[in-house]
Amino acid sequence: MDSSSQKYLVKKRVKIHPNTVTVKYTSHYPQPGEEGYEDGNEDTGVFMEDSPKTRLLNAGKKRERTFFGTIDTQLQPAQLPKPREMGHFQNFPEGNILQSRKMWIVLFGSAVAHGCVALITRLISDRSKVPSLELIFIRSILQVLSVTAVCYYHEPPFGPKGYRLRLFFYGVCNVISITCAYTSFSIVPPSNGTIMWRATTTVFSAILAFLLVDEGMASVDIVTVVGSVFGVCLVMIPNIVKEENSLLSTWKEAFGYTMTVMAGLTTALSMIVYRSIKDNISMWTALFTFSWTGTVWGASTMFLLQEPIVPLDGETWSYLLAICLCSTAAFLGVYYALSKFHPALVSTVQHLEIVIAMVLQLVVLRILPGTYDLVGGAVILVSVVFLACHKLSWKNLGRQDYQEIVDSSIK
């Protein structure tokens, strides 16, 4: 043992228990006024030597920037609040309750709006025969007016510098998803296409969030997501099996369902991209990006791929305006919730669209849901209500905000 280590005394503490004897050794460093204390220059505040090992450790703590956000290269274990901190959270439960309730009201409202869009899309397809790309074009032109909100909040319409590429990529993903979804509705029954679109969006958002940004979910959230997807499958699969088609129609419908899967994949990807830039891009800027990219895409493709028509009657224009209003409300609700919740959870709540669409079809179109539709809708409803009750429970309100911030790797 060298002389430098011998000058510090080693103290031994013995703790005697009825069954065991614990010995603990601790190093004692001389304090000011004691023998062996060396007076260092405390004013400088520099006590760490600059060595290659130190530089390597410091470099390991730096943050790595990726296309989808900023991710820690060394993930620190999530630490729960201390009991004193939990007491601090419990001192202000009313604000947490109001904020959480507001968030869930917005989510449920967006699900209702999505259900209205599904019904109106079917009505305009059956009665007005408006092609899907023209529908996207007209909807996007009306949503371009969201630039007024962007200018009102003094935000750059095309996003701040450093985020424009990701914002443009987000808009392209959204336009591709809507195009694939609306195109599939002309090949497969719109109800089946909408259901598969929602189910694949939920599954892909959970997978992509984990793979791209390392954002996981709690075990209770996973159970509710799986239960809701199971309910969606109960509604969708029997409807597909009952269809009797020829070989050519089978291949055509296979292409249609492939388009819905692509719509779900690109929708999930757009949600992940927005979640990585949500701190710098507002939902109004995101809506404007979606609208102008949709306008450019619809104007350049609807004359090449489809035969557009000119809506002349007031009924068609009322459907178009209703679709625009409902889709805008649903869009803002979903992307407002994305700033708080995991994308898979947001998509799971939107499964209520299927239940809302069933009720609206029964009231407006007099279409009775089948047995599997009722069972699947009940499973979806129970899963979403259980998820909402779990998130709004008193014991989780204190740590919900803290835990989501700690678990998220997007800063």
From Swiss-Prot:
Keyword annotations of the record: Cell membrane, Cytoplasmic vesicle, Membrane, Repeat, Synapse, Transmembrane, Transmembrane helix
GO cellular component terms listed in the entry, alphabetical order: plasma membrane; synaptic vesicle membrane
Superkingdom of the source species: Eukaryota
Subcellular location: Cell membrane; Cytoplasmic vesicle, Secretory vesicle, Synaptic vesicle membrane
Bilayer topology term: Multi-pass membrane protein
Stored InterPro entries: EamA_dom
Segments passing through the bilayer: 104-124, 130-150, 168-188, 193-213, 217-237, 254-274, 285-305, 318-338, 345-365, 367-387
Domain EamA, first and last residues per copy: 112-237, 261-389
Pfam families in the record: EamA
Family label: Belongs to the SLC35G solute transporter family.
Name of the protein in its database record: Solute carrier family 35 member G2
Species annotation: Gallus gallus (Chicken)
